[in-house]
């Protein structure tokens, strides 16, 4: 009776990591590229507002995307305002005006007051 065919030996558990941490020709390990995000800051705000609430990684991804989107909109609008007024520098005034233009009613008022408070705190700490 013929013996059952032997399957190929199973790959070792750590084999995939060895591929990602490949060494360069000069023997140094390749540095992983750092992915910047606002997750640390979103988490800090969440814990300040709702200390007993957590957040999933999917929700954190959505929050990160939201912050990036709002940042780009405000920066774009502030840039346009500076260009219209023939200025080469975006100041807190352009940011404030951009926020007033982009955010609706009460949300804009709160954002402006929080921004003013942050700028005051920053300048007094200098």
UniProtKB/Swiss-Prot annotation:
Primary subcellular site in the record, as a coarse category: nucleus
Modification type N6-glutaryllysine: residues: 17, 35, 44, 47, 109, 117, 121
GO cellular component terms given for this protein: nucleosome; nucleus
Gene transcribed to yield this protein: H2BC12
Record: glycosylation sites: 113
N6-methyllysine: residues bearing it: 47, 109
PROSITE patterns in the cross-refs: HISTONE_H2B (PS00357)
Post-translational modifications reported in the UniProt record: Monoubiquitination at Lys-35 (H2BK34Ub) by the MSL1/MSL2 dimer is required for histone H3 'Lys-4' (H3K4me) and 'Lys-79' (H3K79me) methylation and transcription activation at specific gene loci, such as HOXA9 and MEIS1 loci. Similarly, monoubiquitination at Lys-121 (H2BK120Ub) by the RNF20/40 complex gives a specific tag for epigenetic transcriptional activation and is also prerequisite for histone H3 'Lys-4' and 'Lys-79' methylation. It also functions cooperatively with the FACT dimer to stimulate elongation by RNA polymerase II. Phosphorylated on Ser-15 (H2BS14ph) by STK4/MST1 during apoptosis; which facilitates apoptotic chromatin condensation. Also phosphorylated on Ser-15 in response to DNA double strand breaks (DSBs), and in correlation with somatic hypermutation and immunoglobulin class-switch recombination. Phosphorylation at Ser-37 (H2BS36ph) by AMPK in response to stress promotes transcription.
Positions where Omega-N-methylarginine occurs in the chain: 87, 93
The organism's place on the tree of life at top rank: Eukaryota
Modified residues (N6,N6,N6-trimethyllysine): 86
Residues modified to N6,N6-dimethyllysine: 58
List of residues that carry N6-butyryllysine: 6, 21
Modified sites of kind N6-methylated lysine: 117
ADP-ribosylserine found at: 7
Modified positions (N6-succinyllysine) in chain numbering: 35, 117, 121
Family: Belongs to the histone H2B family.
Name of this chain's protein: Histone H2B type 1-K
Record-listed N6-(2-hydroxyisobutyryl)lysine modification sites: 6, 13, 21, 24-25, 35, 44, 47, 58, 86, 109, 117, 121
């Amino acid at each position: 009776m013929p013996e059952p065919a032997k399957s190929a030996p199973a790959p070792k558990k750590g084999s995939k990591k060895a591929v990602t941490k490949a060494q360069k020709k000069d023997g140094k390990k390749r540095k992983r590229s750092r992915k910047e995000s606002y997750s640390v800051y979103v988490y800090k705000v969440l814990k300040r507002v709702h200390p007993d609430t957590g957040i999933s990684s999917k929700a954190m991804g959505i929050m990160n995307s939201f912050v990036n989107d709002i940042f780009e909109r405000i920066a774009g609008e502030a840039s346009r305002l500076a260009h219209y007024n023939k200025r080469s520098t975006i100041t807190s005034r352009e940011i404030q005006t951009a926020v007033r233009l982009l955010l609706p009613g009460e949300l804009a008022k709160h954002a402006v007051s929080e921004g003013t408070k942050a700028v005051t705190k920053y300048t007094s700490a200098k």
